């Protein structure tokens, strides 16, 4: 029989840190929920709970409206750490 894969249990970083509110101006906190092309990462990849995932999505969308985070990145200019561009 095939060996079963052992998965590491993902946990919510926000629940562990006991964060009550996610501010859209805190781009350092939001970068953990964005991919290298500035897409919002799903819960199954980040391990974020439903409550905090909704708060993160709302904060990211507000940060995009305020031009703190770009909507998209050109395919040719994808960087390893996208927050190096933001300063």
From Swiss-Prot:
Keyword Lipid biosynthesis assigned: no
Keyword Transferase attached: no
InterPro entries in the cross-refs: Ribosomal_bS18, Ribosomal_bS18_sf
One protein family per Pfam: Ribosomal_S18
GO cellular component: cytosolic small ribosomal subunit
Family designation: Belongs to the bacterial ribosomal protein bS18 family.
Protein name from the UniProt record: Small ribosomal subunit protein bS18
Organism from which the protein derives: Campylobacter hominis (strain ATCC BAA-381 / DSM 21671 / CCUG 45161 / LMG 19568 / NCTC 13146 / CH001A)
């Amino acid at each position: 029989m095939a060996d079963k894969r052992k998965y590491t249990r993902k946990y919510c970083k926000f629940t562990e840190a006991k964060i009550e509110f996610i501010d859209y101006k805190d781009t350092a906190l939001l970068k953990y929920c964005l991919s290298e092309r500035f897409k919002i990462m799903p819960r199954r990849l980040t391990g974020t709970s439903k409550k905090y995932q909704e708060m993160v999505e709302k904060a990211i969308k507000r940060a995009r409206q305020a031009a703190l985070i770009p909507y998209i990145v050109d395919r040719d200019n994808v960087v390893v750490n996208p927050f190096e561009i933001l300063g």
